[in-house]
């Protein structure tokens, strides 16, 4: 089976796609996956680093733009459709999956016109604009939250969770590690989060009595690294401050509490890794979807949510103290998070895609069809 995964822009779209790709290529030696994205998106860097080929198209978002920007971006659509057609003819995929982001729109639409099986994977509780549009056409819509189902026709919705990377999935089966000191992991996404960084620093004076008992790993992004590290040291903490954490599996494994945003991929990782969390949703997220995402963990007892407008150093410190100084509460939250985890999401999504392939092409997933086999084009061999 050859799968084409389209979309990206942010890690929340890209990393579930990579997790699905890992599952597809890992289940059969004849399977392969190609991505389609844009030069500006995160996918242009992380997809090749993950070992997958990527094609780039010229397209920009249409939602939330001024009139001039909207008109200019609309002018790119015909070209993006032609580029998508060329890519689909070149790779001849058995199935096309859109993972959200504006790059997925033209590719999935052209695939549908070519009668190639199509699907979308919606990571959030409130479906994004592109997925809502594509949901009218595709053969399947994979969701992680029950709230997202209302955006798609019921017969095609599969609530299977968000795929996560294999290295993180290993944490689901890993026994709970008892650390000599509780460790707090703080991160705001791949670029960091300035507001979250600053509120954590403001919380430290209220946690000064815990400085010998608390270990901290903090991903700041490039902008705030120096200021954050100085803030910790001024309060007597010896933190592990980094611009970017490359091995999130190890970071999660070493954490007893996570303070972070509420993107869908982050929440999927928290639940599979069984980590209690203090969630600070990104206030500018489309349709306020991070708040809706976070509520599912809060209701289950796996997390505490503080909206950014309410976040102060004193309040954050109080929540950190209430969780880290009560091991029994941490354990309850960890168990609740684990019950929400979907470690088989990538496998189950790949299973449905394989069935779409069988129905359309009349051959088992991974089996070659005349004129189409699992061979990469010569320039990417």
From Swiss-Prot:
Its main location: membrane. Residues 361-381 are annotated as: Disordered. One of its GO terms (molecular function) is undecaprenyldiphospho-muramoylpentapeptide beta-N-acetylglucosaminyltransferase activity. Pfam families: Glyco_tran_28_C, Glyco_transf_28. It is found in: Cell inner membrane. Pathway: Cell wall biogenesis; peptidoglycan biosynthesis. UDP-N-acetyl-alpha-D-glucosamine binds at residues 10-12, 124, 165, 190, 245, 290. Its EC number is 2.4.1.227. Keywords: Cell cycle, Cell division, Cell inner membrane, Cell membrane, Cell shape, Cell wall biogenesis/degradation, Glycosyltransferase, Membrane, Peptidoglycan synthesis, Transferase. It catalyses: di-trans,octa-cis-undecaprenyl diphospho-N-acetyl-alpha-D-muramoyl-L-alanyl-D-glutamyl-meso-2,6-diaminopimeloyl-D-alanyl-D-alanine + UDP-N-acetyl-alpha-D-glucosamine = di-trans,octa-cis-undecaprenyl diphospho-[N-acetyl-alpha-D-glucosaminyl-(1->4)]-N-acetyl-alpha-D-muramoyl-L-alanyl-D-glutamyl-meso-2,6-diaminopimeloyl-D-alanyl-D-alanine + UDP + H(+). It is a peripheral membrane protein. The keyword Cell wall biogenesis/degradation applies. GO terms for biological process: carbohydrate metabolic process; cell division; cell wall organization; lipid glycosylation; peptidoglycan biosynthetic process; regulation of cell shape. SUPFAM superfamilies: UDP-Glycosyltransferase/glycogen phosphorylase. InterPro entries: GlcNAc_MurG, Glyco_trans_28_C, GlycoTrans_28_N. Signal peptide: none annotated. The keyword Acetylation does not apply. GO terms for cellular component: plasma membrane. Belongs to the glycosyltransferase 28 family. MurG subfamily. Cell wall formation. Catalyzes the transfer of a GlcNAc subunit on undecaprenyl-pyrophosphoryl-MurNAc-pentapeptide (lipid intermediate I) to form undecaprenyl-pyrophosphoryl-MurNAc-(pentapeptide)GlcNAc (lipid intermediate II). This is UDP-N-acetylglucosamine--N-acetylmuramyl-(pentapeptide) pyrophosphoryl-undecaprenol N-acetylglucosamine transferase. It comes from Anaeromyxobacter sp. (strain Fw109-5). The lineage of its organism: Bacteria, Pseudomonadati, Myxococcota, Myxococcia, Myxococcales.
